[in-house]
Amino acid sequence: MVLAGPAVVLADAPTVLGDMSLWEYCVAKGYADVTLTKPQIGPNAAFNNWRCVTAEGDLRPFSMVQVCKWEYNLTAVQAHPIDKNDAYTWLCYSVGH
Protein backbone atom coordinates (compact mmCIF):
# COMPACT_ATOMS: atom_id res chain seq x y z
CA MET A 1 0.00 0.00 0.00
CA VAL A 2 1.37 3.41 -1.00
CA LEU A 3 0.14 6.50 0.75
CA ALA A 4 0.56 9.84 -0.90
CA GLY A 5 1.69 12.81 1.16
CA PRO A 6 0.02 16.19 1.08
CA ALA A 7 0.04 17.92 -2.26
CA VAL A 8 2.36 20.87 -2.55
CA VAL A 9 0.82 23.93 -4.14
CA LEU A 10 3.09 26.79 -5.03
CA ALA A 11 1.58 30.26 -4.92
CA ASP A 12 2.35 32.77 -7.61
CA ALA A 13 4.95 35.34 -6.68
CA PRO A 14 3.52 38.76 -5.81
CA THR A 15 3.07 40.99 -8.86
CA VAL A 16 4.07 44.66 -8.73
CA LEU A 17 1.02 46.90 -9.10
CA GLY A 18 2.87 50.19 -8.80
CA ASP A 19 3.56 53.00 -6.40
CA MET A 20 1.27 54.77 -3.96
CA SER A 21 -0.46 58.15 -4.00
CA LEU A 22 -0.07 58.94 -0.31
CA TRP A 23 -1.24 62.56 -0.48
CA GLU A 24 -4.32 61.58 -2.47
CA TYR A 25 -5.06 58.78 0.01
CA CYS A 26 -4.89 61.09 3.02
CA VAL A 27 -7.01 63.77 1.34
CA ALA A 28 -9.59 61.15 0.29
CA LYS A 29 -9.78 60.09 3.95
CA GLY A 30 -10.52 63.67 5.04
CA TYR A 31 -7.04 64.80 6.04
CA ALA A 32 -5.29 67.97 4.87
CA ASP A 33 -1.86 66.62 3.95
CA VAL A 34 0.73 63.87 4.32
CA THR A 35 4.16 64.16 5.92
CA LEU A 36 7.21 62.27 7.11
CA THR A 37 8.01 62.11 10.83
CA LYS A 38 11.74 61.54 10.27
CA PRO A 39 14.15 62.07 7.34
CA GLN A 40 13.42 60.43 3.98
CA ILE A 41 16.79 58.65 3.98
CA GLY A 42 18.25 56.88 7.01
CA PRO A 43 18.24 53.60 8.90
CA ASN A 44 14.80 52.01 8.43
CA ALA A 45 13.40 55.33 7.14
CA ALA A 46 10.73 53.50 5.14
CA PHE A 47 9.08 52.16 8.30
CA ASN A 48 6.80 53.99 10.75
CA ASN A 49 7.47 57.32 9.05
CA TRP A 50 4.50 58.49 6.96
CA ARG A 51 1.50 60.21 8.58
CA CYS A 52 -1.68 61.88 7.40
CA VAL A 53 -2.01 65.42 8.76
CA THR A 54 -5.31 66.80 10.09
CA ALA A 55 -6.39 70.39 9.40
CA GLU A 56 -5.28 71.16 12.97
CA GLY A 57 -1.81 69.74 12.32
CA ASP A 58 -2.24 66.48 14.23
CA LEU A 59 -0.53 63.41 12.78
CA ARG A 60 -2.39 60.17 12.10
CA PRO A 61 -0.63 56.90 11.20
CA PHE A 62 -1.94 54.75 8.38
CA SER A 63 -1.27 51.34 6.90
CA MET A 64 0.58 51.07 3.60
CA VAL A 65 -1.49 47.94 2.87
CA GLN A 66 -4.66 50.02 3.26
CA VAL A 67 -3.23 52.57 0.82
CA CYS A 68 -2.65 49.76 -1.70
CA LYS A 69 -6.19 48.46 -1.22
CA TRP A 70 -7.56 51.96 -1.80
CA GLU A 71 -5.21 52.79 -4.70
CA TYR A 72 -5.81 49.60 -6.69
CA ASN A 73 -9.29 48.62 -5.44
CA LEU A 74 -8.05 45.15 -4.46
CA THR A 75 -8.12 43.24 -1.19
CA ALA A 76 -5.30 40.74 -1.75
CA VAL A 77 -2.36 43.12 -1.67
CA GLN A 78 0.95 43.62 0.07
CA ALA A 79 3.07 46.73 0.53
CA HIS A 80 6.87 46.67 0.72
CA PRO A 81 9.63 49.24 0.31
CA ILE A 82 12.29 48.53 -2.28
CA ASP A 83 14.84 50.12 0.05
CA LYS A 84 14.14 49.97 3.79
CA ASN A 85 16.33 53.05 4.26
CA ASP A 86 14.32 55.28 1.87
CA ALA A 87 10.76 56.30 2.75
CA TYR A 88 9.92 57.02 -0.90
CA THR A 89 10.42 53.47 -2.20
CA TRP A 90 7.11 51.79 -1.23
CA LEU A 91 5.35 49.67 -3.86
CA CYS A 92 2.07 47.77 -3.94
CA TYR A 93 1.91 44.10 -4.93
CA SER A 94 -1.02 41.87 -5.80
CA VAL A 95 -1.09 38.43 -4.19
CA GLY A 96 -3.28 35.36 -4.21
CA HIS A 97 -3.95 35.16 -7.93
Question: Which residues does each predicted region cover?
Answer:
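Secretory targeting and sorting signals
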Residues: 1-11
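Mitochondrial intermembrane space
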Residues: 9-97
